[in-house]
Amino acid sequence: MLLIHIRSTRKILALGRHVFPSNAFFSVSSRPSLSSSDEVAAHDVASLLKTPNWEKNSSLKSLVSHMNPNVASQVISLQRSDNDICVRFFMWVCKHSSYCFDPTQKNQLLKLIVSSGLYRVAHAVIVALIKECSRCEKEMLKLMYCFDELREVFGFRLNYPCYSSLLMSLAKLDLGFLAYVTYRRMEADGFVVGMIDYRTIVNALCKNGYTEAAEMFMSKILKIGFVLDSHIGTSLLLGFCRGLNLRDALKVFDVMSKEVTCAPNSVSYSILIHGLCEVGRLEEAFGLKDQMGEKGCQPSTRTYTVLIKALCDRGLIDKAFNLFDEMIPRGCKPNVHTYTVLIDGLCRDGKIEEANGVCRKMVKDRIFPSVITYNALINGYCKDGRVVPAFELLTVMEKRACKPNVRTFNELMEGLCRVGKPYKAVHLLKRMLDNGLSPDIVSYNVLIDGLCREGHMNTAYKLLSSMNCFDIEPDCLTFTAIINAFCKQGKADVASAFLGLMLRKGISLDEVTGTTLIDGVCKVGKTRDALFILETLVKMRILTTPHSLNVILDMLSKGCKVKEELAMLGKINKLGLVPSVVTYTTLVDGLIRSGDITGSFRILELMKLSGCLPNVYPYTIIINGLCQFGRVEEAEKLLSAMQDSGVSPNHVTYTVMVKGYVNNGKLDRALETVRAMVERGYELNDRIYSSLLQGFVLSQKGIDNSEESTVSDIALRETDPECINELISVVEQLGGCISGLCIFLVTRLCKEGRTDESNDLVQNVLERGVFLEKAMDIIMESYCSKKKHTKCMELITLVLKSGFVPSFKSFCLVIQGLKKEGDAERARELVMELLTSNGVVEKSGVLTYVECLMEGDETGDCSEVIDLVDQLHCRERPTF
């Protein structure tokens, strides 16, 4: 147990020494004497402190700008009679002197005050420092280490106000263990702990999940005469709910409900409701909310917000709004967190405009968005690929004095990576530093993953090396991104080297990383190496499922190595892993590839006998095999048998059947299957469109299906507009969505250089009120590659006049093309059109960002930015 194993309060000192090693340069065991000029400066400052509003005195600011801790302590010594002035000056000089700004230097100044015997001043300063450090765990640990040094070197001890403030701050920082250690030292120093302090300790332990320790501590305080109250009961509820131990939480709540002295209040109910929501017990949570009214305890804003978030997390946005509408009539005013939860829920559901509407209502109600609110909106825009409005929000934040945090920049960097601009995201890293923020592991993982996805491995590695500058260690996700990228490039050896580096750093790899490497090794044909890695990872207990084995099976399947596949099935059993549906499906695929349809049916029966019932995929693979061998009637029978066994066909099954019918000259049956597919709610896909196009070409040209090898070329190169229009008409009659079909056709036509026909197709669809953003991107890319920027401008104008907005990618392609052609004026006009069409109001603020995004991505430029980031971080304030 936590409380039993604590033997000495020196554990704080040991922890402090481990994290923050002592610096002999700051030793104050012997205080240096001041020079005559320093003495004069100290007296000058001390005299200025007697004037009114001395904090605003420009002469004083100039005097202290480079004042070191020794001179500052002398000033405080000269003012020792006025405790308030001493504390105010201490905090003020630490903000304005470059030699007293750092937490270590503040602690140095505190040591000098204690060494001068100014204990009363020191105690008051300590209370102020504790409050200042109450938001930063690292600074609090440094301060506690300083307290231990003061005790050891000078025999200085904290007084009761210091201890009480320290307990509260440790509880706020979720440092329950240190709160208890502090309590033990407090007792050892002879202080009688009050009820407020006991509550604080119980709360701190519970917030950290030390509920058993909290219960033991509570038993102790009950024995000495204190009573169980609502505060302590609520703390226990919090501890159990945070640990998702709802059984014990409900027991505590039951006890509280029966005792008058600790009756649950609104906070108690809200905590328990939150706990129930966290484990998915929403009905009980809502029942508890209804019970509150019966017990005379009205739901608070926090109660409603918790329930609204739970509904949003389940995608029940409409119900969340119904609950929101219930708040004001019940006397509960929504706060910034309530609105933020709704905005976040809408953004995750892809309803960005509705989220914006909620934000506008929020401001109208005089509730101003927080940084978390803005982050939710920025995340929504970035996930939708709309980086321009996301950057406008950044400028709005800055204008409204809502300082962006690390999460803000992480969202924006991820957004840039999503639209294929990881280099611009690296530039944003520098902007983050300029804002006084330091990147975290998420920042680096986003950037490295983005660079790896685009194949920029040298820059990714340079960024990996720069993590040390911020004392950030790469984690499993960092290395997995790099390993995955090298594997995709066919560089399995390099990927293996990074795995070795990862292990040497003591980073535990997970199943995803292991499977990624095995997949990469398999793709370069190194089966033995893949097996060796697999067996090693199984022995390390990293691989607990057959996913990695399935990867090897898949490689063998594609090579039609059936014997090796069956041997691998035996190895799965030998390693103690249970074959999954995927394992058997891969075996079926291998047998079909080798032409052994009978064998694939045997595997299907084996699955049923082993209790691993086949799903739609093994059936579909066999159906596909039968169709490929011209046995369409047998495929139909298997499809019927599959449905009789309770397995419904999916879009892949329908796709296979459509292709099979077309290849066997049965276009009518293919169209019937498409109709059935649409009626069951499945969307048509590119493979369906390709098969239908092939069928129409065969029918129109009168080509026999024995000439199938030429059909693909004909479908791509010789499809005439009449055939395309007929295909669109038929798909529409069958109930299919023509958007997907048109995007498919545009892609194919542009690949064959028939961009003008693609343009005509998109314009025809646009006249019917349908805008195909992806199709337009493809057309823009095709035109820009041929430097036909006027065509692009005409299409952009037409789309805007139709009430739609082209994508950021389309604008970007044309603007960059115009710049390369030297047409800066038209490029600038298009940038302004981009801002206007995206509803950007603050054009001047966001213009700098957008123009930067429109510039080309240069590798060298990006490397220079990384070097500059390293240099910026390494600049430190002068130390004394």
Curated annotation (Swiss-Prot):
Q: Give start and end residues of every PPR repeat.
A: 159-193, 194-228, 229-259, 265-299, 300-334, 335-369, 370-404, 405-439, 440-474, 475-509, 510-544, 545-579, 580-614, 615-649, 650-684, 685-721, 738-768, 772-806, 807-842
Question: Which positions make up the signal peptide?
Answer: none
One Pfam family of this chain: PPR_3
Transit peptide positions?
1-89
* Record carries keyword Aminoacyl-tRNA synthetase: no
**From which source organism is this entry?**
Arabidopsis thaliana
Q: What cellular component terms from Gene Ontology apply here?
A: mitochondrion
Q: Which family does it belong to?
A: Belongs to the PPR family. P subfamily.
Task: Enumerate the UniProt keywords alphabetically.
Answer: Mitochondrion, Repeat, Transit peptide
UniProt main location, coarse: mitochondrion
Its localization reads:
Mitochondrion
Report what the protein is called. Pentatricopeptide repeat-containing protein At3g07290, mitochondrial
Decide whether keyword Membrane is in the record: no
